Amino acid sequence: MRNQFDLELHELEQSFLGLGQLVLETASKALLALASKDKEMAELIINKDHAINQGQSAIELTCARLLALQQPQVSDLRFVISIMSSCSDLERMGDHMAGIAKAVLQLKENQLAPDEEQLHQMGKLSLSMLADLLVAFPLHQASKAISIAQKDEQIDQYYYALSKEIIGLMKDQETSIPNGTQYLYIIGHLERFADYIANICERLVYLETGELVDLN
């Protein structure tokens, strides 16, 4: 009986990691669509967001079934609760990437664009944080989770610097307001995306240590 339960817990973790990988792939495509202003790719990202939503629902149903039908130990409870909470964060992260794709559709050519290099670095760091987290999670590496979450401070710095630049450009040139507004949405989505990564890092620390920490 216990062996079967352990197998189900392993399958649950694999489903969670698969959802995380799907979010990572979606984020990569969203940032590529942004860099290339590829509206066709942006449309595809928006249309496929339901796959992430379905993945979240399936994982939550599995968690509920395991809690209701099995007799989990304390460590099992921590694991299932951590997965359930974290998959909700992954779903929201997918929503933010769909939000970036929607903003790409609204961008006008030959109008305001902020520091592309800084925006690229912000996106690149967000992707690396999620990729590192997906490696650390199955290993239950709390120390790695803490170091990943600490990178959110750099994301915030990018956000504030880009916000200041974009608002300044919008003030100087009224015609830049439509694009500027969309870029403010974009960097806001990236900032929240990284915040959710930090949330999952907190759950990974809880999973290993049983301690509730604030890393965000």
Swiss-Prot record:
Keywords: Cytoplasm, Phosphate transport, Transport. It is found in: Cytoplasm. Belongs to the PhoU family. Its main location: cytoplasm. Plays a role in the regulation of phosphate uptake. GO terms for biological process: intracellular phosphate ion homeostasis; negative regulation of phosphate metabolic process; negative regulation of phosphate transmembrane transport; phosphate ion transport. GO terms for molecular function: protein homodimerization activity. One of its GO terms (cellular component) is cytoplasm. It holds the Pfam family PhoU. The lineage of its organism: Bacteria, Bacillati, Bacillota, Bacilli, Lactobacillales. The keyword Cytoplasm applies. InterPro entries: P_transport_PhoU (IPR028366), PhoU-like_sf (IPR038078), PhoU_dom (IPR026022). The gene is phoU. Homodimer. This is Phosphate-specific transport system accessory protein PhoU homolog.
